[in-house]
């Protein structure tokens, strides 16, 4: 498997009126992995649906999208544009195993990022009792342990993530690969160079896992 690819950086779908497109990855990234790992009719899951890029592209390519989204505005905006809108659940991905999802063929997402020197934990909506980077990584492992139960055996799972510069550097790619490989089999790390990307965002990382 090639561990370095180049894809066009173009955000094709307009952002919703309530926020910019800063949280989404380009549609080209989803197309690449759907071509690589899925076929028409396959069930594609995104546990952190965000602005719906994975789900929209999956539906456009004849796959069946499923997902979860915690933010009510994002959920309503995405669900309102999906043909399979009932497959998107408004709720906490930490409860994915309780939603009654069918077995999935493929999973792709960009989870909420967290810097190691921050206390506000996006996976707990900032609950002070769940603050800190260690609890973030622990929660991410627990979420993917649940996701594994709704995936078919040997199903491929892609996690897009970036290292976070700043006053304290966060090696998020390394930390997520080590954390999630405790519940999934790490197959590869693919570096994606952006053709036409922003000056401060020339590449990203995709961790490739296989369900055990």
Describe each region flagged by the PLM.
Residues 1-212:
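Class I S-adenosyl-L-methionine-dependent methyltransferase catalytic core
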């Amino acid at each position: 498997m090639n561990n370095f690819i180049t894809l066009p950086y173009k955000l094709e779908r307009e952002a919703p009126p309530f926020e910019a497109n800063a949280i989404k990855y380009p549609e080209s990234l989803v197309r690449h992995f759907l071509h690589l790992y899925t076929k028409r009719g396959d069930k594609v899951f995104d546990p952190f649906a965000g602005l719906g890029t994975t789900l929209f592209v999956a539906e456009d390519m004849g796959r069946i999208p499923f997902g979860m989204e915690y933010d009510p505005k994002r959920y309503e905006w995405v669900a309102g544009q999906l043909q399979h809108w009932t497959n998107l659940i408004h709720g906490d991905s930490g409860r994915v195993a309780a939603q009654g999802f069918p077995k999935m063929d493929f999973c792709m997402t960009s989870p909420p990022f967290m810097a190691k020197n921050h206390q506000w934990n996006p996976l707990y909506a900032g609950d002070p009792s769940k603050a800190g980077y260690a609890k973030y990584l622990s929660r991410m492992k627990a979420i993917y342990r649940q996701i594994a139960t709704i995936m078919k055996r040997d199903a491929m799972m892609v996690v897009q993530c970036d290292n976070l510069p700043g006053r304290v550097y966060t090696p998020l790619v390394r930390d997520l690969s080590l954390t999630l490989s405790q519940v999934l089999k790490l197959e590869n790390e693919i570096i994606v160079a952006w053709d036409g990307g922003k000056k401060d965002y020339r590449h990203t990382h995709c961790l490739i896992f296989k369900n055990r």
